[in-house]
């Protein structure tokens, strides 16, 4: 009998975590497509893999079972023919490719073994990589495309497993991701949870393909209390729909909708604040005095949405504590901005008072240590080119309950 899956906090001892080791999908990045694929540079892939291996080894050394998304995907494709059909259907963009090419591509993908199919579903495929016997005389799309263009687009953001599935209590949320470059990620996590034997019997919470919610915006502040950032990725409609779904399933009694700036540096709530202990949060200094929250609560008569209030006060009230301790990165403004950009506030808690952080954020880490938080550092010079830190790169599937 394995560990019971589920999580009701950000800081309970981490028992099972889903990661994605970066691979061939990062080698698809070029100066022409980095903006489209949401990267700020071209990572040195082998170094990024070394950094990720260090991260995975650290989590394992602290007692977490590390599940790799590519392994889960391959195993699900091997286990289920329905999984294969689901993955192929999501990857073949018939409106863009046209019916003749879509049919030929689908037939080719059906011929692949599970490992090779998993590779194509994550790394993508160019027109040059189509089988040599693909008919060119029936597809204008094939005739007119440049050989290096993608017939299946790669998923370089898969490394950020936080966004495409969220465990809340014993259930998993498969959200709708906001940007085109990431939409298919959710289809792969959906496939894994639906068809991998490890997740047999796991029930879903909140499934939407219309109102975007991303996992980086969802923080489990305490049992029954969920904060949802509303900004560049998660919409107000998505936050409200998630809240109502959690109430209906008795997974939360309070949801805090937290407006954040609609800019890349603050794309998710966890880029400006994360929990580091049961009553303690690290927060970007520039938002400490301005971050607000709308409290959404379930009542006997339905759902009420309160007026905006200071976030720390609203959070403490919902959590049932006197005060939320905030460790802010209130150093030199230039250093604070640099370290926020480098995911200094994007920590991953392994247990109450124990977090993983990028080593490069020296001053933020020092402030955490001065406040009594144990900080375990990892390298991230290459992993950080996609604008994500340790929390972004991890999907906790099981934590000890608080």
UniProtKB/Swiss-Prot annotation:
Q: Name the Gene Ontology biological process terms.
A: arginine catabolic process to ornithine; arginine deiminase pathway
Any GO MF annotation of the entry: arginine deiminase activity
Q: Which gene encodes it?
A: arcA
Gene Ontology cellular-component annotations: cytoplasm; plasma membrane
* Name listed for the protein in its UniProt record: Arginine deiminase
Q: Where is the active site?
A: 392
- Principal subcellular localization: cytoplasm
Family recorded in the similarity comment:
Belongs to the arginine deiminase family.
* Top EC category: hydrolase
Q: In which pathway does it act?
A: Amino-acid degradation; L-arginine degradation via ADI pathway; carbamoyl phosphate from L-arginine: step 1/2
């Amino acid at each position: 009998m394995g560990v019971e899956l589920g999580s009701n906090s950000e800081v309970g001892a981490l028992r099972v975590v889903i990661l994605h080791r970066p691979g061939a999908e990062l080698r698809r990045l070029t100066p022409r497509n980095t903006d489209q694929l949401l990267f700020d540079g071209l990572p040195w892939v082998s170094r990024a893999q070394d950094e990720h291996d260090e991260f995975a080894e650290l989590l394992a050394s602290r007692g977490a079972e590390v599940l790799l998304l590519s392994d889960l995907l391959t195993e699900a494709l091997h286990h289920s023919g329905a999984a294969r059909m689901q993955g192929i259907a999501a990857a073949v963009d018939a409106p863009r490719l046209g019916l003749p090419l879509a049919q030929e591509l689908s037939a080719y993908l059906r011929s692949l073994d599970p490992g090779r199919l998993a590779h194509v579903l994550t790394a993508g495929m160019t027109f040059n990589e189509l089988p040599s016997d693909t008919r060119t005389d029936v597809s204008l799309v094939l005739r007119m495309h440049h050989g290096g263009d993608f017939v299946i687009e790669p998923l370089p953001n898969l490394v950020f497993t936080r966004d495409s599935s969220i465990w809340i209590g014993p259930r998993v949320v498969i959200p709708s991701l906001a940007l085109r470059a990431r939409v298919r990620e959710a289809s792969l996590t959906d496939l894994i949870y639906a068809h991998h034997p490890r997740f047999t019997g796991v029930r879903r919470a909140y499934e939407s393909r219309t109102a975007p919610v991303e996992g980086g915006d969802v923080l489990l502040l305490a049992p029954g209390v969920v904060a949802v950032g509303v900004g560049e990725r998660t919409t107000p409609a998505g936050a409200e729909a998630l809240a109502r779904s959690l109430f209906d399933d008795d997974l939360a009694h309070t949801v805090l909708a937290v407006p954040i700036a609609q800019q890349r540096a603050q794309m998710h709530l966890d880029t400006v604040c994360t929990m580091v202990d049961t009553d303690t949060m690290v927060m970007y200094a520039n938002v400490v005095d301005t971050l607000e929250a709308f409290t959404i609560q379930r009542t006997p008569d339905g759902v009420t949405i309160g007026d905006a209030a200071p976030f720390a006060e609203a959070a403490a009230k919902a959590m049932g504590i006197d005060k939320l301790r905030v460790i802010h990165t209130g150093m030199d403004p230039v250093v604070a901005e640099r370290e926020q950009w480098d995911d200094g506030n994007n920590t991953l808690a392994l247990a109450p008072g124990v977090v993983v952080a990028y080593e490069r954020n020296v001053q933020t880490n020092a402030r955490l240590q001065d406040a009594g938080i144990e900080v375990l550092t990892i390298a991230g010079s290459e992993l950080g080119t996609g604008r994500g830190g340790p929390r972004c790169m991890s999907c906790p599937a099981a934590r000890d309950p608080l």
